[in-house]
Amino acid sequence: MKTLYRDNKGLHRWLFACGAVLVLFYLFRGNRAAVNFWVYSVTLPFEQFLGRACAALPFSVAELLYVLAAVTAVVLLVLMVHYLIKSRQKGRAAYRCALFVLDLFLTVCAAFSLLWGANYYADDFCDRSGLSPEPVAYDDLVRVTQYFADHLAEASMHIARDENGLFTADRQEILNYADTVYDCLYDEFPFLDMPDQKPKGIFFSKIMSAMNFTGFYFPFTGESNVNMDSPAMLLASTCAHELSHQRGITSEQQSNFLAVLACTRCDNANYNYAGWMLGYIHLGNALYRVDPDAWQQIRDSLPDEIVLDLRYNSAYWAQYKGLTATVTQSLNDKMIKSYGDELGTQSYGAVVDLLVNYYA
């Protein structure tokens, strides 16, 4: 046993170092003051620095790292298989390979916990703003859903449509506007004020669609990344959602709420439409679950072109329903819950409580 440890001393020290970081993380995660200092004075400024550095490049560094990681994984697998075949002491060789893989995995876990996981235990948007997702009354839900439907119809009059009647816009122009979309919220929520880095479009966006993702924030580069293949009508609200993560906000319900608020208040027609659309979709889904007739009445009041956009969006995502999307969303749900967010991916729907309480 001593020989086994001595022969792999570096790998064992690496393992203990990662383990120590994770233990310290779980010990201190309940100390709100310490976590707030770590998030808002250390990691958030560091991620903003990374984001500014990566912003100079015209492509997503996060996507490049994912591709390099996949290629590296294949190369390492081949090398380890070759090493195991050639080794005379296959048990020791297998142990060394397993230890190396474990070290890599724990390194990623430790780094992710420090850069992003800590945010789940810091003061969130609701803590800092005083807003709270309290349970909502039925009448308020109906009224706010109708309010969003009316404003969605108004916003629809100011956007462009293609020959099929669907929403159309230059996707790059939507991305270019994103770094100003939060300007309208700084007076009400001054703690949100920070320089934004424009979201990056993902080249392999169809893979994101297969995984049922419209966007993601990558803390290792400070970049917000968005799906450029999914329906354009919600691209603007996706950009706003991902930019909320640049501010250290982890809760998906709070990020969606901020996306709706920022998009509907800014002076860009495409963002206005996406914001009212995102809010209506969440509110409409909630209303449908409690009163399908009330939902149908509001749905029938929408202009035909909006219904066309909604149907196109549903049809697009329907083609990607399958094992890949199910597994990916399940893993994402478990990851979010592992950091104390009991709603997991369902927190995307809890945005309804915030919207109704705010607009009622």
Predicted regions and their residues:
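Active-site recognition of the HExxH zinc-binding catalytic motif
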Residues: 58, 235-256, 260-261
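Transmembrane alpha-helices and immediately adjacent membrane-cytoplasm interface residues
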Residues: 74-78, 92-126
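Alpha-helical transmembrane segments and their helix-start/interface "positive-inside/aromatic belt" motifs
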Residues: 5-19, 96-101
